[in-house]
Amino acid sequence: MIQVQTRLQVADNTGAKELMCIKVLGGSWRRYANIGDVIVCSVKEASPGGVVKKGDVVRAVVVRTKKGLRREDGSYIRFDENAAVILKDDKEPRGTRIFGPVARELRDKEFMKIISLAPEVL
């Protein structure tokens, strides 16, 4: 569960290292985001020479959460960190590589490019 002010790691090679959620998209009173949801973030930490700089406002999709999520078969999937992938305007990833595992639920939300770039889909 990601809410406003939550810090997330970046799971791609855009140059950003840490993001802070500033808005959960999908309704005026929506408070929490889960895996597969799009959020608006501010870049809090970035490496020099990257595509994005510190202070940039970007959209990102949540790919891993500590809270985890319940699947239809009753099983749960949970990760060690909160992580997101920075998106372009057409919901394609801005980077060319994805680091770490991603959840299978991204396929249902039609983030097929992220699924294909990820080294592991759980």
Curated annotation (Swiss-Prot):
Entry annotated with the keyword RNA-binding: yes
Ribonucleoprotein is among the record's keywords: yes
Keyword annotations of the record: Ribonucleoprotein, Ribosomal protein, RNA-binding, rRNA-binding
UniProt xrefs under InterPro entries: Ribosomal_uL14, Ribosomal_uL14_bac-type, Ribosomal_uL14_CS, Ribosomal_uL14_sf
Transmembrane segments: none
GO terms under cellular component: cytosolic large ribosomal subunit
Disulfide partners: none
Homology family: Belongs to the universal ribosomal protein uL14 family.
UniProt xrefs under NCBIfam families: rplN_bact
Biological role stated in the UniProt entry: Binds to 23S rRNA. Forms part of two intersubunit bridges in the 70S ribosome.
Binding partners and assembly: Part of the 50S ribosomal subunit. Forms a cluster with proteins L3 and L19. In the 70S ribosome, L14 and L19 interact and together make contacts with the 16S rRNA in bridges B5 and B8.
Protein's name in the database: Large ribosomal subunit protein uL14
Species the sequence originates in: Symbiobacterium thermophilum (strain DSM 24528 / JCM 14929 / IAM 14863 / T)
